[in-house]
Amino acid sequence: YAHRFYGFKGEAQYLHGHTGVLTIEVEDSVNAGVNMVFPCNEIQKTAWDVLKNFDHALILREDDPLLPAILDVYEKQGIKNGHPNNVMKGEAFKTELATAYPDCRLVVTKETMTVEGMIKIVYDLLKDKLNIAKITFSSGVNKASEEFQTKNQIDRCPLCGIALNENGICPKCGYKKQ
């Protein structure tokens, strides 16, 4: 992702990029059907569904004067509303903390995008999908962690361990809760 610290007086005020590493720890009871809390690959898939919006994206604070200029350039290039080559994108989202515009690879945030800010956004996006106990995010030489109280009662499939949808059906294997 690329970003900058708008209003900051230092190197980070300039537009620059990072590769981030995100670690999500979940906590719950062991699902007797599969003898695990949650399949690791499903944690990754669940997280990636929303977090892929940050991959190769520009992240700007909502009051950054670069934002209208970037959108103007994207409009002139014909890529503001998407492009056939823009295939790595998630579903658009809008929360109190951030809004994703996947068609133009842009995430607009309320706060400056720091590692601490990313943790807040990730937790907000995933708190209803996973029982998150801890999130750690590192980007460049910066790293932060935050622990959370797990409180969700998430119905999970006894056959494959992933969360059932609102109708009590497993989206992976089709199991139906009785």
Name the predicted role of every residue range:
Residues 1-152:
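Charge-rich, low-complexity N-terminal segments
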Residues 15, 166, 172:
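Short glycine/serine/threonine-biased micro-segments
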Residues 154, 167:
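Residues immediately within or flanking Cys/His clusters that coordinate Zn2+
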Residues 158, 171:
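Cys/His/Pro-rich metal-binding microdomains
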